[in-house]
Amino acid sequence: MEEKEKKPGFFKRLVSGLTKTRDNIVSGIDSLFSGFSHIDDDFYEELEEILIMGDLGVRATESIIEDLQRKVKEQHIKEPAECKELLIESIKEQMKVEETAYRFENEKSVVLVIGVNGVGKTTTVGKLAGKLKEQGKKVVIAGADTFRAAAGDQLKEWANRAGVDMIGGAEGADPGAVVYDAVAASKARNADVLLVDTAGRLHNKENLMNELGKINKILESEYPDAYRETLVVLDATTGQNALVQAREFSDVAKISGIVLTKMDGTAKGGIAVAIQSELSVPVKYIGVGETIDDLQKFDSDEFVNALFDTKTE
């Protein structure tokens, strides 16, 4: 089942969820466009400030401004109001997700999911399991976050809800051993995707690096043919702090995608643009609520349209 058939209403929830971000960024852009009678350096400087203050980040903002200046010059645009569509296009171009980004869905694969406690990591694993199951995939979950007492129970609940198998360990068990058992179970059950929930103890990078290193070694020796995906889960409400976390995780793991949770009700949704630009890693999923359907593949057109509220379904 191709996920372009998004459940009706997701766009509306996205528009609603991005209200605070819209108030934070778009209202400033609108007043800028109506407040200037012509395009000059002051106009660009003020636009730059609005975008940076809206959590789009310095690198993405500079790239957007440069792109806009080039297009304005090429198209001989004089009126600020005529820039809005070009600005929207420039922001979309910062966040394009390649079709190959979801290759793991179509091959026998292992998806490591990392993230600090409280960002919605375990919930994301559960929702992903549900989405893959809906697509007809056979899924196994490995509960390798054995350091957090509630993680195993929470994951078990999600596994039951999604109707998928889970391999876990007792609190404090060796995460590597859990992954080893989960690989064996995946092979025995001919699973399409093994989702691994890992501990996100960023405050002790050395431990985390060792743990991920051990998991990777097990996967390389026991499951060498499996396609590998590593997703980092970030809480959009933390804004620039999410970017800092992403950078730190990229020091210890080869991150291939980002999941941004809690996009509903944050004024810092612009971080979705900043992260992709700063790290050259795509945002692959965004979450705007509690249910399985509230986690969806990231679509830059849809996101920016929802941000600017430029179309409705």
Task: Report each predicted region and the residues it spans.
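Non-catalytic terminal/linker segments enriched in charged/polar, low-complexity residues
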Residues: 1-100, 106-113, 130, 134-139, ...
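P-loop/Walker A NTP-binding module and the surrounding RecA-like catalytic core of P-loop NTPases
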Residues: 92-95, 100-313
